[in-house]
Regions:
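Acidic, contiguous N-terminal accessory segments
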Residues: 23-169
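Generic recognition of cysteine residues
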Residues: 6-7, 41, 96, 298, ...
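Feature activates predominantly on carbohydrate-active enzymes
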Residues: 102-312, 316-337
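Bacterial N-terminal signal peptides that target proteins for export
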Residues: 1-11
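Residue-level detector of intrinsically disordered terminal segments
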Residues: 1, 23-26, 222
Length: 337
């Protein structure tokens, strides 16, 4: 099991190639930088083009709303900054367009860097759908930031085409065992989008904690979202003790997402071409639900109790359990589009 610290260290390590200043003195061709590797890419090390730090981007009038929204996301990510729309194509540093008929998921794109007079670079990015143009820019983030100089970017000219091999490119974040704040989830989404991952699988419930507000069952989060911190700081499921009452003063580790916070995460991820997929564990791995609502148990054991006590499967034969499942799913459908 990877804990939160390891998870973020891995994300930081993966993102190094996309951070300003991460480039080497030698100019790196696109095929040596891009991760994942594009479908096809060709560079010319002998022809280096130069781009300013703050790129002026041209788009046809019909595409301006799409491109402007995309540049706002890129500026917010902070790896490239100062991206702006220009109406003057001749002076643009990058030319973007959405054209053609989308095939498959519409995530494919083409990109090339040309070298003009006095070594001036011009980026050309083309896709048949907005999501393809988004991924074209994520590739440019990687290539440009790996070739940053003091005054801008110096990059070997290239031409590339990219179409995803897999439609579902996902990562699972277990927020039940180790809670991640909204800000931390957003940071993870940014790292995912940089590397063209498009599904965030949120493991919202398990024995160690329930992490999403369900308005009809408030004890799920007022009790089962909190547990007593482990003394040595190491993960040990057998030692997990959930709050035995609301506002238990000993149960200080944990947290949960309100439904509005989850909608905020979903919208943030959607703007970065990431779909959030919720997971609610049933009928097993349900100790957190049973802990808060004892009528989900077959043998009538009084809950809450401390620790796992060997039981983590709800009783699917009871009308109360079926009603609980339906109610939870109904609220999930209202939150997740």
């Amino acid at each position: 099991m990877m804990n939160k610290g390891c998870c973020f260290r891995l994300a930081a390590w993966l993102a190094l190639s996309g951070l300003p200043g991460a480039g080497m003195a030698e100019m790196l061709p696109a095929e040596e930088v891009l991760l994942p590797a594009p479908s096809a890419c060709r560079s010319d090390r002998a022809a280096v083009a130069h781009l300013p730090l703050r790129l002026a981007v041209y788009a046809p009038e019909k595409d301006v709303p799409v491109v402007e929204a995309l540049l706002n996301v890129l500026n917010a990510q902070g790896v490239l900054s100062g991206l702006s729309i220009t109406r003057d194509k001749a002076s643009a540093d990058a030319v973007c367009s959405v054209e053609g008929t989308p095939s498959g998921t519409g995530e494919g794109y083409e990109a090339r860097l040309e070298r003009g007079g006095e070594g001036r670079g011009i980026l050309h990015l083309k896709a048949a759908a907005p999501q393809g143009l988004f991924y074209a820019w994520q590739s440019m983030v990687q290539v440009l930031s790996a070739n940053r100089t003091g005054e801008g970017f110096s990059v070997p000219v290239f031409s590339l085409r990219d179409v995803p091999r897999f439609e579902w490119r996902g990562m699972m974040l277990d927020v039940s065992r180790h809670f991640f704040t909204v800000a931390e989830v957003k940071r993870m989404v940014d790292a995912m989008s940089l590397f063209k991952l498009n599904r965030l699988h949120l493991h919202l419930t398990d024995g160690p904690g329930w992490r999403l507000e369900i308005k009809k069952y408030p004890l799920l989060t007022s009790m089962s979202a909190w547990r007593v911190p482990l003394a040595d700081g190491e993960w040990n499921w057998r030692e997990v003790k959930l709050a035995i009452r609301e506002h238990d003063p000993e149960a200080t580790y944990g947290g949960f997402y309100t439904q509005e916070q989850m909608r905020e995460i979903i919208a943030y991820a959607r703007s970065r071409q990431v779909t959030v997929v919720p997971e609610i564990d049933l009928p097993g791995h349900s100790y957190a639900a049973m802990h808060a609502y004892g009528d989900l148990i077959c043998d009538g054991v009084d809950f809450p109790v401390e620790g796992k006590k060997g039981r983590d499967a709800v009783c699917m034969g009871r009308p109360e359990t079926l009603r609980f499942v339906k109610d939870v799913v109904d609220e999930l459908k209202d939150v997740f589009p």
